[in-house]
């Protein structure tokens, strides 16, 4: 077995993703390697290579703030998530336009209440403009669009529909999460139109509409987790959580 000083030297040449991969391999080898992989000094060294938004640097800062109980509650107390649901048929859930629709999702971190404000697919932009331009005081902003597109929507209309909603997100940048709920036929039409866009979005088959609130809740939690600067975790994330966060980015995924 190599001396620890040499092992530290070897690990110091690895970037974060390589270090995580090596951590997985070493966890099955011996306790010495596993302990070195998880050593906070090694992660501090890696954090110095990144800017202030680095998740790894956030971990180090959070570790220094473990005694701040009130900060941790931001990640664990109930989260209100507001969004806008657009549908021409209510194919995934019967919407009553003008009535707020609520779905609850519990993950292992906190309770999430996802509120949809429903609007019809066509002529919805003017209604959305009205609510976004109003002041809501201390209410949370509208985070996301959920857009239901079934086979009754002509294919030739879909590019304009998507362009309109993407344009809204540019005007109101706090709305940058998109969940498209579609039939298989529409998935094939929409996918090439939205691929490559620098937005957080996901396409769901209409049979999996129940997963939309779960996905949105997880996205919002990861943003709170990665971007906050005044809260901390009770403990460092596990190696599997580090691996997920190292790969996490805005991407298009068909569920």
Swiss-Prot record:
Pfam family, one: F-box-like
Gene3D superfamilies membership: 1.20.1280.50
InterPro entries: F-box-like_dom_sf, F-box_dom
Superkingdom of the source species: Viruses
UniProt domain F-box: residue ranges: 1-46
PROSITE patterns the record matches: FBOX (PS50181)
Name of the protein this chain belongs to: Putative F-box protein L126
Lineage: Viruses, Varidnaviria, Bamfordvirae, Nucleocytoviricota, Megaviricetes
């Amino acid at each position: 077995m190599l001396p620890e000083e040499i092992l530290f030297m070897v690990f110091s040449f690895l970037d974060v993703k390589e270090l995580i991969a090596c951590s997985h391999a070493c966890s099955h080898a011996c306790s010495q390697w596993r302990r070195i992989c998880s050593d906070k000094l090694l992660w501090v060294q890696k954090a110095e290579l990144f800017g202030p938004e680095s998740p790894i640097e956030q971990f180090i800062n959070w570790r220094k703030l473990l005694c701040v109980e009130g900060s941790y509650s931001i990640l664990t107390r109930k989260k209100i998530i507001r969004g806008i649901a657009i549908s021409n048929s209510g194919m995934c859930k019967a919407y009553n336009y003008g009535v707020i629709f609520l779905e609850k999702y519990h993950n292992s971190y906190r309770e999430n209440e996802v509120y949809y404000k429903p609007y019809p697919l066509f002529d919805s932009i003017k209604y959305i403009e009205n609510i976004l331009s109003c002041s809501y005081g201390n209410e949370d902003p509208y985070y996301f669009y959920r857009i239901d597109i079934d086979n009754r929507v002509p294919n030739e209309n879909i590019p304009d529909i998507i362009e309109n909603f993407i344009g809204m997100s540019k005007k109101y940048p706090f709305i940058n999460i998109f969940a498209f709920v579609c039939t298989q036929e529409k998935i094939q039409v929409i996918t090439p139109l939205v691929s490559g866009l620098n937005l957080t979005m996901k396409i769901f088959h209409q049979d999996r509409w129940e997963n939309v609130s779960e996905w949105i809740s997880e996205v919002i939690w990861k943003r709170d987790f990665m971007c906050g600067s005044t809260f901390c975790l009770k403990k460092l994330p596990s190696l599997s959580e580090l691996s997920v966060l190292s790969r996490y980015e805005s991407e298009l995924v068909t569920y």
